[in-house]
C-alpha cells in the first residue's frame, strides 16, 4: 500500500498481488486503510454488491438512495461497493456477470439506475450528495477482460453460482484464466452462501491464479461489521416498499 492510488502494490510493481478472503469486507478495508482514491475496478460478480446505491449513468454520478438511513446504508458484503463509491475510493467501475446473473436474478434491494421507475421518487426528491462515477454493466459475452490499470474484484459466485454445473463453472473460469492481462491487483471472495458447494473447485481456481500471475495468495481474515437494527418507522415503510417492489419485479419493471 505504498501509494493512495495503489492499495495492493508491493516493492515489485510489475508483480500482481492476489488477495483471497471469504467475503468482500476485507477489500473495503484495504482501500480504506490505504487511503485510496479514484480507483478503476472491474467487479466480476453474480450480484452487484451495491445495495442502496442509485447510479445516474447518463451524467456519470451516483448517490445513496436512502440519503441518511443508517440501517439501509450499513456496510456488508452486499453494499461494500456502494460505500467504496460514495467515499471516493472507486470512481470507475465495471460490473461483469454471466447472462444468468445481474439485477434480473438478484434480490429486490440491488443497485438502482436512473431509468428505473422505482428510482423516480428518489430522483424527484432530489439530493445534493452525488459523487462522480463512470459505470458500465457487461455480460461475459461483451467483456474483453480487465483493462490496463484496473483492479480485478472477483466474487466466486460470479463464476461458480450455486445452481451451475461444473462444466459451466469451468467455462467461466477460463474467462479469467485464459486471458492475457496484468491487473493492478486481484481480490477474490469465496462467498460461500451463494457459490457452488464444491470447495475443491475454488481452491483449484486460486492455485491456478497463483500460477498465472507467478505469485502466492495472501489470505485475509474474516471481517464482520456492526449491522444495527431498523427503526420502527423504517420497518413500516419497508413492508410497503417490499410489496410494491416484488409486484414490479414480477412484471419486469424496475
Question: Predicted regions span which residues?
Answer:
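Short, solvent-exposed beta-strand-terminating loops
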Residues: 38-59
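Catalytic cores of soluble, metal-dependent hydrolases
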Residues: 1-41, 60, 68-254
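Acidic/polar active-site rim loop that often engages polyanionic ligands
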Residues: 64
Amino acid at each position: 500500500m505504498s501509494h493512495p492510488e495503489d492499495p495492493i502494490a508491493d516493492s515489485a510493481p510489475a508483480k500482481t498481488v492476489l488477495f483471497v478472503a471469504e467475503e468482500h469486507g476485507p477489500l473495503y478495508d484495504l482501500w480504506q486503510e490505504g487511503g485510496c482514491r479514484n480507483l478503476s475496478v472491474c467487479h466480476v460478480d453474480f450480484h452487484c454488491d451495491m445495495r442502496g446505491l442509485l447510479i445516474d449513468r447518463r451524467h456519470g454520478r451516483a448517490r445513496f438512495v436512502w440519503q441518511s438511513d443508517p440501517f439501509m446504508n450499513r456496510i456488508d458484503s452486499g453494499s461494500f461497493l456502494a460505500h467504496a463509491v460514495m467515499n471516493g475510493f472507486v470512481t470507475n467501475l465495471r460490473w461483469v456477470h454471466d447472462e444468468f446473473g445481474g439485477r434480473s436474478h438478484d434480490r429486490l434491494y440491488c443497485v438502482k439506475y436512473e431509468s428505473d421507475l422505482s428510482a423516480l421518487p428518489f430522483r424527484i426528491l432530489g439530493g445534493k450528495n452525488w459523487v462522480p462515477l463512470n459505470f458500465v454493466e457487461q455480460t461475459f459475452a461483451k467483456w474483453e477482460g480487465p483493462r490496463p490499470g484496473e483492479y480485478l474484484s472477483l466474487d466466486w459466485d460470479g463464476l461458480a453460482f450455486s445452481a451451475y454445473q461444473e462444466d459451466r463453472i469451468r467455462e467461466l473460469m477460463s474467462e479469467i484464466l485464459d486471458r492475457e492481462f496484468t491487473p493492478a491487483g486481484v481480490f477474490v471472495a469465496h462467498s460461500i452462501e451463494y457459490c457452488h458447494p464444491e470447495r475443491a473447485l475454488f481452491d483449484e481456481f486460486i492455485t491456478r491464479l497463483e500460477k498465472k500471475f507467478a505469485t502466492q495468495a495472501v489470505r485475509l481474515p474474516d471481517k464482520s461489521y456492526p449491522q444495527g437494527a431498523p427503526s420502527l418507522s423504517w420497518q413500516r415503510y419497508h413492508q410497503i416498499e417490499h410489496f410494491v417492489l416484488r409486484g414490479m419485479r414480477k412484471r419486469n419493471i424496475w
